[in-house]
């Protein structure tokens, strides 16, 4: 009897220990995620749980609420969260304040080589990797085929352009002028020849000086002296202002309003993100085509295209850094997860093996193939600075003031002084 009791006790102890071990092994990680992707992210997290036993709990927020939650929770040192989506221009700011964990120990050089170079650069602060890219954005030049045909423009020329043979901004303006003379000769129809989807915004407008070899900000991220007061920026700002004065580009229309002009047949050419295609489908718009982003004449080898989207990082205050980093690596840097996300969401990948696969697939749509080429060759990240909010505010004003006819030299001088004043606090 004693032997039986001893045996039962031993079995119970082993069962208890096994249960305890299982509880110890099962991890739960909390992810500050965006509501727009909640369904797709849940599918990915469920797959990760099936494979690893690690449960990912999503807390989904709208864009503004997510940014605020990150500032309020992670910014004050909360240990309740492990993983977060990061709007890429904020990586440096978060890293500087200790809000992101260094992922360098978890991503080898071989791993990083599998990610788009510009995206890795945008996630690197002081030589360390603080987030890993999950999705990307790119630019194409859209044009309204019906308007151009009505204006007597031969579409064959536009159809012949590519990433190897780009239309120049100068030629683009010539075609736009020619079309406007037919479509809106006296300027009473409210037609626009060419414009940027995100007019007045640093994300897209900086593509102009960048495409002449201009840089975004000083190496330390805190100065615009030696940046704005250089030939690329002066030429780009002057060129843009001239197009506004001539009536080729618009004035007084906001970035949120401008795409509507393309949908409604009031805008002939629009430089926009690849995500615009989904909007065209929703609007039942069929009279459009696209080509590669333009180059400035004489600067064909300097083409730079706006890029950057969502990256994934680990909270600097997570109590599960290693497990969280493993998840980040899985979701952003493996064949399985990146292909799943692409199939679910259709966004431009940042995982090079998948980009190569799509580029060689005859079923990949044309705009995606353009985006793949730009991502690998011309993508140029936004300013890498902890002071990005201050930077974007100042540079947005530069573009807006230039558009409204302010003196370019005076605008540049103001911006240099204003940014210097706003970044003093970062140097203390």
Where are the model-predicted features located?
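Conserved N-terminal structural module of periplasmic/extracytoplasmic solute-binding proteins
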Residues: 2, 6-9, 18-96, 106-112, ...
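Immediate post-signal peptide segment of exported/extracytoplasmic ligand-binding proteins
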Residues: 22-30, 49-54, 124-127, 179-190
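Extracytoplasmic/periplasmic substrate-recognition and gating elements
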Residues: 27, 51, 55, 246-248, ...
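Hinge/lid segment of periplasmic solute-binding proteins
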Residues: 86-140, 149, 170-171, 187-190, ...
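Short, solvent-exposed loop/beta-turn-alpha elements that line the ligand-binding surface or hinge
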Residues: 104-115, 158-166, 187, 192-194, ...
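Extracytoplasmic/periplasmic solute-binding protein
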Residues: 126-134, 139, 165-225
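Glycine-centered hinge/linker elements that transmit conformational signals in sensory
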Residues: 173-177, 220-253
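Long, aromatic- and glycine/proline-rich binding clefts that accommodate carbohydrate-like moieties
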Residues: 291-292, 342-399, 426
